Amino acid sequence: MPFRIATWNLERAANARRRADAQHRMAEMDADVWVLTESRRDLSPGTDYRLVAESAPRDDADADERWVTIWTRVEGGSPRATRDDQFTACASIGGLLNVYGTVLPWRGSTCRGHPSANAEAYIAALSVQHEDWRELGDEPAELCVAGDFNQDLSVRSYYWSLKARAYLECALRECDLVATTAAPNDPVWQLTGGEAACIDHVCLSAGLLRRLSGAPIAWRPERDGRNISDHPGVAVTLTEA
């Protein structure tokens, strides 16, 4: 039976119209697990989903805004602790899959006193999250890391830094994770005819992908000509290989 994992940066879902349009588009995507970034804890993908993990409240935004929320319609989800409760969240889904949601630093942002320049902030944040990935990867459950990586893995540099990309690719390899949304399967690249590339990714345990095939898709962040976000959404559907 197909199983779909999706992630979408909702650009803070700042008004009721955008929230309603986002929910309509998410209903169309029909994912089993959602990792939402720059979202709100009360913005559900649908009535049959439960919020199973969330990052800490943002200190720079409305009380209900979160960098990461994880939703599922699968029974048995529960939150897991992470080393960075501001920009990550983690949940055990059905006891078989750990889902780790992330927002990594964007161009111009800082992290723990590290500047954006020379990808210092990116590398600092990634180093902390990498330890979580490594520990989760040692567990019997499979691992999914998804969210806004703020870094393309495409055939041509799009955003943000070749140095950040090199560190990200190394961290994924060390944790035996595969970015299903990387080149040559980048669905945003395909959606836009090469005008843009994925910076939001769904990464899965290599062992899982040896048993199942993962087909990525992307959708435009709009409904009926109205803009919803500045990020396309992406999803990966897992089926028997």
Task: Tell me the role of every PLM-derived stretch.
Residues 1-7, 11-23, 72-241:
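Active-site regions of metal-assisted phosphoester/phosphodiester hydrolases
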Residues 1-49, 60, 65, 241:
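N-terminal, active-site-proximal structural segment of metallo-dependent hydrolase catalytic domains
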Residues 55-63, 82-85:
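Short, ordered beta-strand-loop transition motifs
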Residues 57-59, 65-75:
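Catalytic-core segment of enzymes that process non-peptidic bonds
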